[in-house]
Structures are given as C-alpha cells and as structure tokens.
C-alpha cells in the first residue's frame, strides 16, 4: 500500500528494501505522524457582540473540522501509519476579537474549547497575540486573560510573539509575559502548573506551525489548510546506531537519507488528507519531535554520535549536525517544507533529556546554547515555583535574543511549578511527560527587565 501511494502522488517508486525499512520504522522505531493540524481562518467571524462572535467561531470551527477525525482515522488504517494527534489552529484571537471587551476573552477561549471537543481534536491553538513591535488594546486584553483562559479550558493553547529579527525585542511584552506565566502556574497549581505547558513565547513565530502550543493560523494563510508534523527520533537513532564506527560525515549522510524517507511518508499522508477533505495542503514540518517513550529521544541520537551524556561538551556541535542533516534530507524530499523543521529538545517529553538533567550534565545554560542551532528553544522546562516573574522574563529575553540575532525561530515554554524545588519533579502524563525541577540563577535581573522599551533590531535585519 505504501508503494502504491508513492506512485499515486508522483513520487519515485521505492525499492522493496525501502518499503520494508519504512514498515520497520513504523512498527519498531516509533515513527509516526505526530500531528495533522487544520488551520482555519476566523477573520470573517469578527463581531462586536461577544455572543454572536462566539456563535460564529463555534460554527466555523465545527463545520470545517467535522470530517477531520474520520478522514485521518481512515488514512491511518489504510496506510498503517499511526497519526498521534489531530489539532486545529485558528487566526490569532487578538485579531479576530479586537472589538471584544476584556471580560469576553475568556468566554472566547471556552468556546474554542467546546468546538475542539465537538470536533474531537486533541488541541486547538491560536489564543494568540503578535506584539513584537507593540500592543493594540486587543492584544493586551488577550494577554491579560491568558491565565484564566488556560486554567478554565482543557484543549486551548496560547502563544505570544514578542520579537522578530526585523522589529527587535519588545521588552514591555517580555516583562508582561513573565507575570502571565507566573499567574498561569498559580491558577493551575493543583496540576503542577500545567497551564504553562500550553503557553509559549516566541521570537520569529512561523504562521504555519502544526505543533502545539505555538500553532496559529497566520494572516497570510488561506481560508483553510492542512499542515502536517512528522516524528522520527527513534528511526534516526536506529539508523545511526547501526553504523559501524562511522565518522561524522557518514553519520550526517545517514541522517539525511532517513529524514528523506520520513518526509516522503509525511507528505503522502498530508496530501491524501487534504485531497479527501477538499482542503489545500500547506506544509510538512520536518521537526524531530521526541516522546517520553524509551528510544524515541533526540538526546539518544546525540549520545549515539559518541557523547557519554547529552549536555556534555560537544552537544551543541552534535545537535547542529543533526538539525542540518534533517533539513537537507527533508528539503530534498519535499517542496512543501515549513513550520519549524528541525530538532525539538523539550526536556519533559524526551526520556534522554530527563536522564541528562538528573545526571547533572544538562543545565538551563547548556540548553540555551543548544537552542542557537536547533528548531525551537527552551521547551517544557520546569523551574522552582518561587522563581520570580522578572527571572522568567529575563530567561525569555535571553532566548528571544538568540532568535533575533540568528534570524531563526526561538521560543520559551517554561513551568514555574508551584510548591516545587530543585530535586523535585512534575508529572504531566501523556506526550507532555515529566520533568525534574532545574535550578535558575540566584542573582536578580529585575532592574534590567523593568527598564522596558524595545531592544532595537540588529544590523542584520537590514536586508533590502
């Protein structure tokens, strides 16, 4: 069936060995489609009456996504390729709900939650604001409502873009987001601050990202679109481990070939979902997204290259090799590569990262260095519950600077776990996994953060 599908979409005809390798990846090496995400524009739903607006977005989401679950289940059964999550992303709510009152934004989040449940999807993203150069009244109303919105919903995810290479870093927004994260943790304290696992702060956020918590349907996107995220750390790790005393060039070539196969499979699934739903196919996100399962780990790939433990000296170089090889292999396989496309390093979602933190080899500072060469940023990191809002903002500012200067996407998804200290851990379950509490600096950044203003765009932003 995989061979037939490849021919159907005009791909090269794979050999019998390649087909068997793909089947092996699915059955034994945790290869799957991590997410099929439907992006839906809500721009035509805007209305000053909150009741009408909520009715509009509920109707739009549920009508557009009504066949998503059935269709993906059929394709999963047809091809034998697991599809782990079905998700929805929508137009940033701060734009669609600009005319709503402050007290209306939580009701919008609840409506999104109800629509996601009706559609049967796992998450819905887009409770978002883009404030890299300043905030509108709608942006501020949304940002201030995030803690209550995430505490009172199950499936809603939120993101805020506070920096771009072209605009610089909005430090007023960075300072505000530290407080929002603290408040979100407090309102979900009984669940180890899980609300913060559904909130991400971005620099250079992509408009077509299929992964949560950062997915939103950008204003340059079509009416409705299908974006797909693949997953394959286990397959890449197995391929590297099977090499006999390779040099790093040989490791890179092997990763490229594996990424090529993973990408072909993902594009095949995405295009078939789009065809059956009558919706435009958008992008394929190449990101290697780990899970807490043993063997499905980005850290394990780095250790297979020769590192005793992820986080030791050489880790950043190994991650750069991995990220580059994944992109090269994926770009050869598809003309629809987009989103984040690289390697994720979420601590709580990667068994190898968790062990590295526990062993003391992986620190917050080393993770920050690693984010300069990989797909996203400081992801799913748990810190002590008494971490100040200013310290959280300073961590965000550092990560935004990495993204702005290097002209890449970076992000922070951090959990100040209420009542927890270094040595403790938090348990979220499922794909979110668990995380040991990591220490932060005991020195204050408060005066710096409170200065506010905007860190200007770097000289490399002048590209015209």
UniProtKB/Swiss-Prot annotation:
Family: Belongs to the UPF0210 family.
Paired cysteines (S-S): none
CDD domains registered for this protein in UniProt: RNR_PFL_like_DUF711 (cd08025)
Organism: Methanosarcina acetivorans (strain ATCC 35395 / DSM 2834 / JCM 12185 / C2A)
InterPro entries per the UniProt record, alphabetical: UPF0210
Recorded superkingdom: Archaea
UniProt-recorded name of the protein: UPF0210 protein MA_1691
HAMAP family: UPF0210
Xref: Pfam families: DUF711
Cross-referenced SUPFAM superfamilies: PFL-like glycyl radical enzymes (SSF51998)
């Amino acid at each position: 069936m995989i061979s037939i599908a490849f021919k159907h979409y005009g791909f090269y005809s794979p050999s019998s060995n390649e087909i068997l390798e793909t089947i092996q990846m699915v059955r034994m090496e945790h290869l799957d489609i991590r997410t099929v995400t439907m992006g839906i524009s809500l721009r035509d739903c805007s209305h000053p009456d909150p009741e009408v607006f909520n009715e509009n977005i509920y109707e739009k989401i549920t009508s557009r996504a009504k066949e998503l679950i059935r269709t993906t289940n059929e394709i999963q059964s047809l091809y034998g390729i697991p599809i782990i999550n079905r998700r929805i992303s929508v137009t940033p709510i701060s734009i669609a709900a600009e005319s709503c009152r402050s007290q209306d934004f939580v009701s919008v989040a609840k409506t999104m939650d109800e629509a996601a449940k009706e559609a049967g999807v796992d998450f819905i993203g887009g409770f978002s604001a883009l404030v890299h150069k300043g905030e509108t009244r709608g942006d501020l109303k949304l940002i201030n409502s995030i803690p209550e919105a995430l505490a009172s919903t199950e499936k809603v995810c939120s993101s805020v873009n506070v920096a771009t290479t072209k605009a610089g870093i909005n430090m007023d927004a960075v300072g505000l987001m530290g407080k929002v994260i603290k408040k979100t943790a407090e309102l979900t304290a009984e669940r180890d601050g899980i609300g913060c696992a559904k909130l991400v702060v971005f620099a250079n956020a992509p408009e077509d990202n299929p992964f949560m918590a950062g997915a939103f349907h950008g204003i340059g996107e079509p009416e409705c679109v299908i974006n797909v995220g693949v997953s394959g750390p286990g397959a890449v790790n197995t391929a590297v481990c099977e090499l006999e005393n390779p040099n790093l060039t040989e490791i890179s070539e092997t990763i490229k070939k594996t990424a090529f196969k993973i990408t072909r499979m993902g594009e095949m699934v995405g295009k078939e979902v789009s065809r059956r739903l009558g919706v435009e196919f958008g992008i394929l996100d190449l990101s290697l997204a780990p899970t807490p399962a043993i063997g499905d780990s980005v850290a394990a790939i780095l250790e297979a290259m020769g590192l005793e433990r992820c986080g030791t000296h050489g880790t950043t170089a190994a991650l750069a090799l991995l990220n580059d090889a994944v992109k090269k292999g994926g770009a050869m396989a598809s003309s629809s590569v987009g989103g984040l496309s690289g390697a994720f390093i979420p601590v709580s979602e990667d068994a190898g990262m968790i062990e590295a933190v526990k062993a003391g080899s992986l620190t917050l500072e080393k993770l920050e260095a690693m984010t300069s060469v990989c797909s996203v940023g400081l992801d799913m990191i748990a810190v002590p519950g008494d971490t100040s809002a200013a310290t959280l903002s300073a961590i965000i500012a550092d990560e935004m600077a990495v993204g702005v200067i290097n002209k890449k996407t970076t992000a922070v998804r951090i959990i100040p776990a209420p009542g927890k200290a270094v040595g403790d851990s938090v348990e979220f379950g499922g794909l979110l996994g668990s995380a040991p509490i990591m220490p932060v600096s005991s020195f204050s950044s408060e005066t710096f953060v409170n200065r506010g203003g905007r860190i200007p765009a770097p000289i490399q932003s002048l590209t015209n």
